[in-house]
């Protein structure tokens, strides 16, 4: 499986964020998008997810499910946690499991992998910011999708939770998944490729 982006140009509000951006990510690879605020990191992810239209270029996933669209094979996690505050953690994940093609049996294991089995029956409004973020991250594993698009996924996470999520990401890569993540902070993914956005022609290379 391979994610291929070719000659991507994105404009917003009359401003060109980037132009002629091309990259690939193979099964088992992570691609980390870096750059200053306003360089277009979030917009790139939203374009890959199909929420924004690129002015030029295209994106495709080769070797995935032949009858499914790119979006149907993608998990997108943005800045917002996308949780209902009145519902419990388990109820929120149950909703997303149904929406994304998972099942109710996947909810408890997903919470456990993020260190949250004890909050399953707590309303989300009673959780801390870090716990809410972990519930949102658990959405990635209640339904199997090969491509993960993650925008600042470790926001509000403490060191321990960051380590837990790094393990989740590594497990996804080990099973042949692909991750594209925009971040200002290290994600604990050794050997990840990098794309640096600067609001001008970009470079793609290996992360240090």
Language model: regions and residue ranges:
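A short, flexible loop at the N-terminus of ABC-type nucleotide-binding domains that lies
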Residues: 1-27, 32, 56
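Helix-to-loop junction immediately C-terminal to a conserved catalytic motif
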Residues: 49
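Q-loop/switch helix immediately C-terminal to the Walker
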Residues: 80, 85-101
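Conserved ABC ATPase "signature" region
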Residues: 104-120
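Conserved ABC ATPase signature
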Residues: 123-130
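Hydrophobic anchor residue at the start of the ABC signature
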Residues: 137, 176
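Catalytic Walker B motif of ABC-type/P-loop ATPase nucleotide-binding domains
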Residues: 148-152
């Amino acid at each position: 499986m391979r994610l291929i982006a070719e000659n991507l140009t994105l404009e917003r509000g009359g401003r060109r964020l980037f132009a002629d951006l091309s990259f690939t990510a193979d099964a088992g690879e992570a691609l980390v998008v870096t750059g200053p605020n306003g360089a277009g990191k979030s917009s790139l992810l939203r374009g890959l997810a199909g929420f924004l239209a690129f002015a030029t270029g295209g994106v495709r996933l080769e070797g995935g499910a032949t009858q499914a669209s790119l979006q149907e094979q993608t998990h997108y996690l943005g800045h917002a946690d996308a949780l209902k505050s009145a519902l419990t953690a388990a109820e929120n994940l149950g909703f997303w499991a149904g929406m994304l093609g998972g099942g109710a049996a996947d909810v408890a294991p997903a919470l456990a992998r993020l260190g949250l089995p004890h909050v399953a029956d707590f309303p989300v409004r009673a959780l801390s910011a870090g716990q809410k973020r972990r519930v949102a991250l658990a959405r990635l594993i209640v339904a199997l999708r090969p491509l993960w698009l993650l925008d600042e996924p470790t926001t509000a996470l403490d060191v321990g939770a960051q380590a837990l999520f790094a393990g989740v990401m590594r497990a996804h890569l080990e099973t042949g998944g692909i991750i594209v993540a925009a971040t200002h902070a290290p994600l604990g993914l050794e050997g990840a490729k990098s794309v640096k956005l600067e609001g001008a022609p970009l470079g793609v290379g290996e992360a240090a």
